[in-house]
Amino acid sequence: FEGNRATGVEVQSGDEIFGVESEEIILSAGGIGSPQILMLSGVGPADHLKEMGIPVQLDSPGVGQNLRDHPNVRVPVRVKDDFPLDPEAPRSQLALRYTAAGSSDRNDMQILASSFSSPMGGDPAAGEGIRFTCVLELAVGAGEVKLASTDPDVQPFLDYRYLDEPWDRERLREGVRLCLKLLEHDVYKDIVEGLISPTPQDLVSDDTLDQWLLRNVTTTQHISGTCKMGPDSDPMAVLDQYCHVRGLEGLRVVDVSVLPDCIRANTNATTIMIAERVADWMS
């Protein structure tokens, strides 16, 4: 930085570290990497930067906040011996998109049907059965990204805060129950042997199912919103509508982190659109 203008980046290539300068810097490191790099550069919540021993270039409290994602849980089932489990075959070819009961947000839920399921954290080619994946497409809750170290090679701390909000738990809970109802259909009678998870004990009440949700909820890898754009009136808006970092010159963020909220779909196409739009402005 020279004053409040970004003038370049420090780059590591192999064992070599060098600087690259430009009239305008485009930061495009994703929903985790972009806020991390900004904070390591002194742009972020001042208290957190001081806590990490980083000189404050710009107090921007929204950097790393507003972490949005699509929380999901998996409902795996055992299959009968004659059902083919092929790890090489296409797995997810069918999805149900729907609006949760009582929701004012259209298409806020999704259920994916998969013809092959492997254990969480295990060998992806080891078949345990088939599964439904229940996805909350528009969560109310939001998390944060914070630095764990001043070393850029150390992954920052991710606090997703999944299902902190009762409405998020309610919708995902009912989504799981819809998965179980689908499994009662006649077409599954010759396929399904029984549930792997949740267990009958997990299904006793809303509270027991909520505990199962909290143990099993995971990311759909659509982390968004951690450098969100917004109007002047929003103190948590990191960027303006043209993706410029507010309070600085010569620096934009262009990736999924600019979204104010996670879209109700996979994020890849939208991220490409954002990049194409900014490229038009720069040309």
Where are these regions (language model features)?
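FAD-dependent oxidoreductase catalytic-site/capping-region signature
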Residues: 7-8, 80-84, 91, 95-270, ...
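Glycine-rich loop(s) and the adjacent beta-strand/alpha-helix scaffold that form part
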Residues: 2-87, 149-150
